[in-house]
């Protein structure tokens, strides 16, 4: 029995290669179904995201190796011109389990501790299960990975602290104003960065969000998605600056979108009530002289990146705790695999002794009363349980290496004269 993982990710291949080898959900299901239905694999699962495409396979044939699976995926994607086996990693046995545990717990991600990957692993398992390609091995592997991720999230701080510019901006605003639900927010720019910032604001209970954008339809679409339905024409939003406690800018512009001259009258009308401006533009959208105004807090990308760097360092300090959780679960998973390997021998051993018991009792069936026969049966059951206890315990005992499992199995089968088991996936 073996479980293999091969794949490309942000560590092994550039984005062009990752894009070329990635699979849609339809392709994912078709690919794993083909592996299993063709008799190449007992089980198969594919995890395909923007940063990785990874296969998890329980081979049904000795020929199905890591190299075979690399070539099989390259051929399926018709990507031989662009993709080479050197772009892939390979993992085997418990190394495969360790890798998936690290992926699910977000320590193998491009951004350490990012929260999306667990949902993506769960989706990969769902696809495999629906395609009837997830058997006992992949099911146990994935559910253990889910358990690892849950423990990592609850017992460590690996996912705490903002590590994206848009989220760092919102986190900073929350630190300054505490309750964002009481604040009015202006978003200048409805592009990708602005959209992320608005969604993070909404997630932190900000509900009074007004959006302005050069293309008004884009602002309206985002406002509708958030459910705020509040927009301002880009040409006139500066007339309303005094209304806002938080201003987020994320536009592409050669000149400053906000200047000191814009904010001076706004602050006067606010009677110097505090305002935070979060400049997410590159180049900067906001005149740095604005920060000289009283009760004005201006933070740009460099300020936010400093926050991100500090948060990433805090996350890195949590890595030893994460690895300890993974090691603990890996030991348990390895012991479970070992139990699977010895299970046929345990079943054969028990069956042989039960057969002997039944034959011997049959000899006395008509020589003793039914009540005496039942007592004899209970007695022999207790004797068998005690006789088999030690060999079964020895087979199940934890081991340091998988090499000793065959020797244990062979010893028991030889001592008790058990026939060779039928070949199976375990």
From Swiss-Prot:
KW Oxidoreductase (keyword) present: yes
EC identifiers of the protein: 1.2.1.70
Pathway given in the UniProt record: Porphyrin-containing compound metabolism; protoporphyrin-IX biosynthesis; 5-aminolevulinate from L-glutamyl-tRNA(Glu): step 1/2; Porphyrin-containing compound metabolism; chlorophyll biosynthesis
UniProt superkingdom: Bacteria
Catalytic activity as recorded in UniProt: (S)-4-amino-5-oxopentanoate + tRNA(Glu) + NADP(+) = L-glutamyl-tRNA(Glu) + NADPH + H(+)
Annotated site residues (Important for activity) in this chain: 99
Record's keyword terms, sorted: Chlorophyll biosynthesis, NADP, Oxidoreductase, Porphyrin biosynthesis
Binding site for NADP(+): 189-194
Molecular function terms from GO: glutamyl-tRNA reductase activity; NADP binding
Binding annotation for substrate: 49-52, 109, 114-116, 120
Protein's GO biological process: chlorophyll biosynthetic process; protoporphyrinogen IX biosynthetic process from glutamate
Residues annotated as catalytic: 50
Function according to Swiss-Prot or TrEMBL: Catalyzes the NADPH-dependent reduction of glutamyl-tRNA(Glu) to glutamate 1-semialdehyde (GSA).
Family: Belongs to the glutamyl-tRNA reductase family.
Domain notes: Possesses an unusual extended V-shaped dimeric structure with each monomer consisting of three distinct domains arranged along a curved 'spinal' alpha-helix. The N-terminal catalytic domain specifically recognizes the glutamate moiety of the substrate. The second domain is the NADPH-binding domain, and the third C-terminal domain is responsible for dimerization.
Miscellaneous note of the record: During catalysis, the active site Cys acts as a nucleophile attacking the alpha-carbonyl group of tRNA-bound glutamate with the formation of a thioester intermediate between enzyme and glutamate, and the concomitant release of tRNA(Glu). The thioester intermediate is finally reduced by direct hydride transfer from NADPH, to form the product GSA.
Subunit structure: Homodimer.
Protein name listed in UniProt: Glutamyl-tRNA reductase
Lineage of the species this protein comes from: Bacteria, Pseudomonadati, Chlorobiota, Chlorobiia, Chlorobiales
Name of the encoding gene: hemA
């Amino acid at each position: 029995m073996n479980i293999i993982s091969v794949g490309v990710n942000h560590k092994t291949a550039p984005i062009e290669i990752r894009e070329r080898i990635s699979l849609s959900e339809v392709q994912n299901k078709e690919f794993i179904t083909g592996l299993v239905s063709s008799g190449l694999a007992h089980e198969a699962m594919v995890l395909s995201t923007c940063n990785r495409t990874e296969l998890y396979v329980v081979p049904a044939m000795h020929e199905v190796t890591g190299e075979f699976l690399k070539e099989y995926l390259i051929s399926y994607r018709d990507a031989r011109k662009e993709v080479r086996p050197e772009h892939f990693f390979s993992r085997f046995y418990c190394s495969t389990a360790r890798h998936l545990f690290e992926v699910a717990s977000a320590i193998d991600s491009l951004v350490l501790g990012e929260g999306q990957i667990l949902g993506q692993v769960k989706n990969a398992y769902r696809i495999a299960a629906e395609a009837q390609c997830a058997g006992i091995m992949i099911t146990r592997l994935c559910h253990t990975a889910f358990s690892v991720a849950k423990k990592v999230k609850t017992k460590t701080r690996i996912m705490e602290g903002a590590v994206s510019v848009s989220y760092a901006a919102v986190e900073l605003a929350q630190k300054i104003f505490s309750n964002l639900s009481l604040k009015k927010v202006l978003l200048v720019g409805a592009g990708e960065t602005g959209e992320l910032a608005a969604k993070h604001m909404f997630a932190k209970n900000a509900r009074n969000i007004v959006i302005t954008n050069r293309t008004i339809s884009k602002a309206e679409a985002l406002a509708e998605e958030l459910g705020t339905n509040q927009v301002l024409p880009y040409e006139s939003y500066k007339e309303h600056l005094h209304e806002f406690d938080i201003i987020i800018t994320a536009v592409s512009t050669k000149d400053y979108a906000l200047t000191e001259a814009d904010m001076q009258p706004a602050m006067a009308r606010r009677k110097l009530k505090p305002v935070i401006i979060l400049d997410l533009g590159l180049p900067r959208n906001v005149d740095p002289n604005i920060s000289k105004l009283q009760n004005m807090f201006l933070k740009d990308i460099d300020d936010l990146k400093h926050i991100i760097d500090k948060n990433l360092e805090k996350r890195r300090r949590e890595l030893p705790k994460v690895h300890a959780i993974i090691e603990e679960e890996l030991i348990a998973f390895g012991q479970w695999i070992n139990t699977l390997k010895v299970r046929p021998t345990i079943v054969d051993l028990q069956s042989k002794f039960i057969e002997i018991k039944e034959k011997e009792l049959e000899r006395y069936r008509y020589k003793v009363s039914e009540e005496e026969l039942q007592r004899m049966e209970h007695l022999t059951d207790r004797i068998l349980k005690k006789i088999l206890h030690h060999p079964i315990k020895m087979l199940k005992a934890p081991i340091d290496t998988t090499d000793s499992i065959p020797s244990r199995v062979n010893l028991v089968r030889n001592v008790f004269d058990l026939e060779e088991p039928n070949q199976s996936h375990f």
